[in-house]
């Protein structure tokens, strides 16, 4: 294990380091000192940067010295829009298809999990995947879910667009021919009037979330363990901070209690800045008023801190982003209630973040802000930002800049780019969202994923999109003029997020006195071929000087975590994001493609459109192994 290599100096420095990472290619993110060969850490902060010789005097008898073996070291990543609290509470319940390269494999995982899931529990595939990632390039069918898990309820969420349920899940959810469609959603029915197992966001996603909420929840002990393991999974990719954007079915303070307790006991392995999101239409102003009277932005510490309100302030002002459906028309009069909410926050010193997908929504929101600006309420020193902003226009960006706003962009187009392209065309997709135009105006821009329900939480997939403009299926959406170079993109994932929370002096760069948050990468992000970027992981992640993730040569150096619980959890058996084995991956994809050809033959034979599949394949080959 490479944990030595600098001999202690004969005369110990009066302040020796707790940790030294040597023999590294350190990208600091600091324009004043962009590179180094070693980094020293003490008391959770960066003590010094230099080369191995420079830092030799900081090595004492108790110093842990890690040889990076020439690997790239970067500042810890910061996802500026991640539903980390909700994700943590559900992580061990979910079967993750993130990174799985074939539908055949995904369905095999489903069938295997059905064999261990106890009666009464559901199998949940909770987003983070797209058919474009599969060799077969298609969705699963309800029939395939029924075949894989005939008796165990299965709920498969596909982005914010749709969900598939097997027969057992339809029964468990209580859906019948008499169940009414929820507002903004559709329960698809067959000719007999019975639910088929397909749910559509048309365009609102409430039908998807409310159905998923019918599944059993974890008890508090398992919610705690689940959160610990989700944070460690994020650490696996070099994430050291995140801005939690709240979300539906995430109630304050009840659903925040787990992370509050982990912060109290010093067990968080990720720094979290969190927002508060009114949950019930018609009660938004009452919720916001109560919060402004009981808590304040800044409450907490460097590990867990309240940042403000959002990403929704009022439900009527939210435009949903199912690009398979037309842009939703918001109510003609939503501004009246929305103005009251924003006024309340600004008058009480609260910042906020605001979900806004379409420029049409952004322009209406900006008109409200400009009205309040005339009264001196903007910018007023309160941090505020738009989330998503896929179709924001240049003149709207100018208005955002004038009002002191910022933006958080995500790689939803990595997963939804195909349907966006189909609806709006190549010209619109080429600058969705217009990140280059944002940066050219000097706006603060931060990057994130919007995981776990749409994109995967893997930040390297998001970075790949920023530098290539390609979907996970390889479709090129953005021309070279709209792309970022690798250092620019990394800056959005480090310094950008720190600026949104006012922590740019201590976070997002490797500089003396800053938080000791860093990642030693499996491959050099700055030099590897573009197609390799999504496969990057961290082999050593340090947060506040603590080693919270260690792999490869460093396995065993990380802080201990409790076993995954419950024992039947999909995470206990499959882990989270599917691992890539590099060269072995090509062989696996070839196998998947071969299997998909067999699958197509089987489907054709079943429909009468092709030759019989033969006696060896009386059932779907996806489910026969």
Residue ranges of each PLM-predicted region?
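Flexible loop residues that form catalytic
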Residues: 29, 128, 247, 389-390, ...
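His/Asp/Glu-enriched, well-ordered alpha-helical/loop segment
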Residues: 343-353, 357-384, 388-389, 394-398, ...
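In a subset of proteins, long, contiguous C-terminal domains/tails are tracked
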Residues: 17, 24, 48, 348, ...
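N-terminal export leaders
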Residues: 1-2
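Residue-level recognition of conserved beta-strand edge/terminus positions
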Residues: 126, 157, 410, 519-522, ...
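Divalent metal-binding segments
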Residues: 5-23, 27, 31-290, 303-361, ...
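Accessory "access/gating" subregions that flank catalytic or transport cores
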Residues: 297-300
């Amino acid at each position: 294990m490479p944990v030595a290599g600098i001999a202690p100096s004969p005369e110990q420095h009066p302040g020796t380091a707790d940790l030294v990472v040597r023999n590294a290619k350190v990208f600091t993110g600091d324009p004043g000192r962009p590179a180094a060969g070693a980094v020293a850490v003490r008391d959770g902060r960066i003590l010094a940067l230099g080369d191995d010789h420079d830092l030799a005097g900081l090595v004492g008898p108790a110093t842990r010295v890690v040889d990076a073996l020439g690997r790239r070291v970067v500042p810890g990543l910061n996802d500026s829009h991640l539903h980390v609290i909700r994700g943590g509470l559900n992580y061990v319940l979910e079967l993750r298809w993130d990174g799985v390269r074939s539908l055949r494999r995904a369905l095999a995982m489903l069938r295997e999990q059905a064999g261990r899931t106890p009666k009464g529990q559901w199998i949940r595939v909770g987003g983070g995947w797209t058919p474009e990632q599969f060799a077969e390039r298609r969705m699963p069918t309800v029939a395939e879910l029924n075949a894989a898990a005939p008796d165990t309820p299965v709920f498969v969420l596909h982005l914010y667009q749709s969900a598939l349920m097997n027969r057992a899940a339809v029964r468990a959810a209580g859906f019948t021919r008499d169940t009414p469609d929820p507002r903004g959603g559709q329960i698809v029915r067959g000719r007999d009037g019975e639910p088929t197992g397909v749910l559509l966001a048309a365009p609102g996603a409430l039908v998807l979330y409310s159905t998923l909420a019918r599944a059993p929840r974890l008890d508090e002990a398992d919610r705690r363990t689940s959160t610990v393991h989700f944070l460690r999974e994020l650490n696996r990719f070099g994430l050291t901070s995140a801005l939690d954007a709240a979300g539906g079915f995430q109630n304050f303070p009840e659903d925040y209690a787990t992370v509050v307790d982990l912060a109290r006991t010093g067990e968080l392995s990720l720094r979290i800045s969190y927002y508060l999101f009114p949950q019930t239409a018609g009660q938004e102003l009452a919720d916001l008023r109560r919060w402004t009277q009981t808590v304040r932005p800044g409450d907490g510490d460097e590990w867990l801190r309240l940042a403000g309100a959002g990403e929704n302030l009022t439900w009527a002002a939210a435009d949903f982003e199912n690009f398979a459906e037309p842009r939703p028309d918001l109510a003609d009069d939503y501004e009246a209630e929305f103005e009251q909410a924003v006024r309340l926050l600004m008058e009480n010193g609260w910042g906020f973040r605001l979900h806004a997908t379409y420029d049409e929504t952004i322009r209406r929101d900006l008109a409200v802000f400009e009205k309040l600006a005339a009264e001196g309420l903007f910018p007023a020193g309160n941090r505020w930002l738009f989330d998503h902003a896929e179709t924001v226009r240049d003149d709207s960006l100018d208005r955002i800049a004038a009002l002191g706003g910022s933006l958080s962009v995500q790689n939803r187009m990595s997963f939804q780019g195909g349907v966006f392209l189909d609806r709006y065309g190549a010209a619109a997709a080429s600058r969705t969202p217009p990140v280059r135009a944002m940066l050219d105006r000097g706006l603060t821009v931060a990057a994130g994923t919007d995981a776990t329900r749409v994109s995967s939480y893997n930040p390297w997939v998001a970075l790949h999109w920023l530098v290539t403009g390609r979907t996970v299926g390889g479709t090129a959406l953005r021309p070279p003029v709209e792309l970022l170079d690798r250092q620019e993109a990394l800056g959005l994932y480090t310094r950008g997020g720190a600026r949104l929370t006012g922590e740019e002096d201590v976070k997002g760069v490797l500089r003396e006195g800053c938080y000791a948050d860093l990642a030693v990468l499996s491959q050099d992000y700055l030099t590897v071929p573009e197609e390799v970027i999504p496969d990057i992981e961290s082999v050593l992640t340090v947060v506040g000087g603590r080693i919270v993730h260690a792999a490869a040569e460093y396995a065993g150096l990380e802080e201990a975590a409790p076993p995954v619980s419950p024992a039947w959890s999909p995470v206990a058996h499959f882990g989270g994001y599917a691992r890539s084995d590099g060269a072995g991956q090509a062989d696996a994809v070839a196998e998947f493609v071969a299997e998909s050809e067999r699958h197509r033959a089987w489907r054709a034979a079943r429909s009468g459109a092709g030759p019989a599949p033969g006696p060896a394949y009386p059932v779907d080959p996806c489910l026969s192994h």
